[in-house]
Amino acid sequence: MKQFQVFTAEEKLKACVPAAIIPYLRIGEEEFGASNRSLTVMFASLGVELSSAETDEGLAHIQNIVTTVQEQVYRLQGSLNKLVMDDKGSTLICLWGLSPFSHEDDAARAILTGFNIIKELTKINTWCNIGISSGECFSGVVGTAGARKEFSVLGDVANLAARIMGS
């Protein structure tokens, strides 16, 4: 007989929230550590088109890619912030330096992670372009009270990582 594991709504939602945010949720902090802080930002453009999501095989490949990237990012205590798939391609945004997972060598961790992502994605016949930048930027929740909000990073550091990825 097949057994099913039962999860609470809270447990399911935690899987959708960056690990660095969970301590703020536990104490009821509304702003989730919104601040200007030193972060390392990685943008990774993946060799996957939006049309890939139209088939079961394509969706399985996308899931495999995201799982591969997550494993590498989490291994060195980074955070997968966002996956965007649109007509311009597919991009992952990853962060290092979010409290409580902040380290003096976050930039080195991001670079090593980038190399590991490229190595692992090559094994599943997927290319990627990566851009990494470090410095001071805003990180926190953006949006309107009573409406949709999301955790984001804003500033020149994030923009530079995106430009490096695209060059």
Segments predicted by a language model, with ranges:
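Catalytic core of nucleotidyl cyclases, primarily class III adenylyl/guanylyl cyclases
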Residues: 38-49, 77-109, 120-156
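Generic non-transmembrane alpha-helical segments
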Residues: 64-79, 113-125
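Phenylalanine-focused residue identity feature
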Residues: 4-7, 16, 24, 32, ...
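Hydrophobic alpha-helical membrane-association signature
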Residues: 58-65, 109-113, 157-160
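Short, well-ordered helical secondary-structure segments
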Residues: 4, 29-33, 81, 129, ...
